[in-house]
Structures are given as C-alpha cells and as structure tokens.
Amino acid sequence: MSDTINSMELRFADNLLPSQLMEGDLIKVDNEYVTIETLTQNEDGFNIYTRNDFDEEGHIYLFDDETIEWYVFFEE
C-alpha cells in the first residue's frame, strides 16, 4: 500500500441516495467497505455492482428513496 493511503483514514461522510452515487465511490454493504464498479437505473431503483478488497464482485439493489453509507479517505 502506498504511503499516501497509509497516512489517510477512512471516514463516514454521509448517507446518500442512489442517484447521488457514482462509480468509484466507497460504500458500506453488510459491514464491508466496497467500491462501486457500475450503476444502472431502472424505473424504480438502481442496480449497484461492487468490488471488495479481495477483488470479489457483489450486487445490491436500492430503491430511489433508500440511502446507503458513503465513505471517503481523509488525510490526517
């Protein structure tokens, strides 16, 4: 891991609606931090495809009005 990442801390930033998310964002799903790979929208919600630190793929579905925890790296 690079020295830059080692000096940064992962912090909770906000609860976001799926329409506020974008590819590359870090979210928390089932007590695991994952990166959003792809988002697709249909008539009532969003398919969100993710990848974890072990390179395992995942999928969640969120309705338009659901929120999810969004995390960012914060430099100390």
Question: What does each model-found stretch correspond to?
Answer:
Residues L16, E32-T35:
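Short, charged beta-turn/beta-strand-edge "cap" motif at the junction between a beta-strand
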Residues M22-G24, F46:
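Short, hydrophobic/aromatic-rich segments at coil-to-beta transitions
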Residues E37-L62:
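Basic/aromatic-rich interaction segments and small domains that mediate binding to polyanionic partners
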Residues I5, L10, V34-I36, I48-Y49, ...:
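Extended hydrophobic/Leu-rich segments
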Residues E32, L39, D53, D65, ...:
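Generic structural motif
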